[in-house]
């Protein structure tokens, strides 16, 4: 009849079944990649990577590739100079799990530990590391250029003479310690020289090493020593793209094996299982996940209590810091 109320619309049975299957699949996908199933274990705390040991910090605002960061440091709170043995020892004494050092070849083929492309910013020398012999570099003051007041005073001047070490000296001085070696020049020869030294280490020592840097330099190390943990732009890109395609299944691709992945927290949310399930999955293939602050530019680390407060809840991976002495007491129980 024309006056009968409209009948309620019923979904076709096939549509209802399809929607139910989709809902179950989505729920399963969520649960399979939910970080809540891989929370922080009892007694576990973040892995602390001490960037260049304990280093002087500086304001990152306005920093570019050409900025002499030694000229813009904060008033020194510690007496240490980056990439020196006193700085590295202090970082480990404070609770660091790994220290990063910068590596360059000297004119006489030695593996020197120094960051900058030129000597002019931090030292009383000029030119590049590669233009000098190790003996010449030893005579420099690696604390010469540091100032917190625009050049009115230089509080670390005279305190860095003879402190520039070599890679073999760092290994000898820090037995058993985990080290990340960052090749500053993206040259195959630099990678081959570092690989030649690393090949002399026993397997248990080699297992504590990570090598990072440009694609060509790191690839040279990986060709000779594929068991060494590596990190470069190409390495990180290949791993994350492959994981984005396959990680929803729980599978970790081979491109993510034996890696160290420095990641800004803001990008982590796009990764299956972020944060702690992703970290746990990477750990199964001998890969470390290291959280860096901001965009990851200019060595931005978690250096203050306020920085530490930004960490994801229950973070079980690594963190990048220039001030292990400040952050370790906040993260290490007792």
Predicted segments, located by residue:
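Phosphate-group recognition and catalysis centered on beta-loop-alpha active-site segments
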Residues: 2-334
